[in-house]
Every structure is written in structure tokens, then in C-alpha cells.
Amino acid sequence: MKYLLILLILNSFTLLSHTEDKSHASAQWQIDAYGSAAPDFIGNYATIIGGNGEILHKGTNGWTCSSANARPFPEMGWSSAHEAMPFCLDENSMKFMNH
């Protein structure tokens, strides 16, 4: 019984410490990271532009999210969402930025 209890405790630590190993250059990581610059009700429905300028997610609410980091997009992606410096703009802000 003691061994079973120890096994269950060790297994629970393993389950709790599991982190999803997602490449920071993947489309899904970029969608999650860049969309996090706005509240969920905006970021979840925004168009997401990836590090290479490609549209990764076509939004439905007129907002656009991307990385504001001016350095070239790293081959392995940004090390964190903080390093990517995500931002989100609505349609009018995008027009202002493009002029």
C-alpha cells in the first residue's frame, strides 16, 4: 500500500509538471501569443499576422494582431510572447498605421 501511495504521488507530480512542447515558430503558438495582446473577446476573433507576414488566422471582428518586434523573425520563433511584443489594432488604427 505504501508503494502504491508513493507511486501515485510521483505520478501526480509528473502530470502537474507537464507542459505542452509547442514550437514558438508554429502558427498555433503565434496565434496564441499575438492574440494575447488583447482581451479574449477581441484576440480570439482577430486576424493574426505571423512573423513572416502571412495571415495565420482570418478574423471576423475587424481587429488585427501581430508582433511589434522590429527584429527579423527568428527561425525558431520568439522565446516568449513578451519578446514578440504582440499588439492588436482595430480597422481605423490599421488605416492610420499604413498611412
Where are these regions (language model features)?
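Sec-dependent N-terminal signal peptides
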Residues: 3-12
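Bacterial Sec-dependent signal peptides at the C-terminal "C-region" and cleavage site
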Residues: 12-21
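Primary mode marks residue(s) on the alpha4-beta5-alpha5 output face of response regulator receiver
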Residues: 20-99
